[in-house]
Amino acid sequence: EQAARVLALDHWMARGVALNAPGPLWRAEGEASGLPPPHLSAQDIVWIEGYLQEPSGFNSAGEPVALNFATGELDTRQLRHPDGVILDIGTHVLAMLRETLHASGGDTALSLSLRVAKDRLGHDIAPGDTSTAEGEAHLQGTLGTIPLNIWLNKYAGPAGGQKGMRIGLRDGRIITFDRAPEGEVVTLQDGERVQRWTRPGAIYTHCLDEQILGADNLFIRAPDSVAGLTQRRLEEVEWLLRLQQQLRGPH
């Protein structure tokens, strides 16, 4: 049975909405005490980066191995294309970046190229290889006229775990959005001065509340935006599939 409407979501979208719709859940810390998180305008943005650096362990041979999300134990699965970082986690990062820019009044037209694609052991993915999963990738392009870089790594080692974005502002300040031990954190860096805000709770929960199930969900507050939001998610998948075809050849 065909649905009358389709809504394409990604839980990371909630991070973009959060920056320009701060609610009472945001808590200022230290120097930021009493101040709301920074309001973002697309006119102020000169560059934007997204990153997902997943923690990993090592097998008995000293090779990097992914970790199971639920248990933190070594993931014994043998990942194969298309389960590499480009399609697996590139979708999350793109959704976060584009929804942030959209909420800031910016142009979300996407242009993207693949700069680096390596396997789990750090070897380049060879043209024509339609089986090896990418463990690391660097994507580069533009959102509208804003330079864009995306850094993806499933094997970032024990120090991994960074998931978020950095936004360079015209006045030299940098906004960073990352995860915190029990939620999310926004920092505003101005030289050596750093202001910080945190929001407890999982991104999944925030997205469900803000976009689907909450009293002020997307269908209530902005029903006319559903089609555009879905179109952006489809465009992102199309771009990533296109990069895979360019990297590996038609398949």
What are these regions (language model features)?
Residues 58, 68-159, 235-238:
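Rossmann-like dinucleotide-binding domain that binds NAD(P)(H)
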Residues 48, 106-119, 173-177, 185-186:
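Generic structural motif
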Residues 14, 29, 90-97, 160, ...:
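A structural signal for well-ordered alpha-helical scaffolds and beta->alpha junctions
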Residues 126-213:
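NAD(P)-dinucleotide binding in Rossmann-like oxidoreductases
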Residues 211-251:
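C-terminal helix-rich "cap/oligomerization" subdomain common to oxidoreductases
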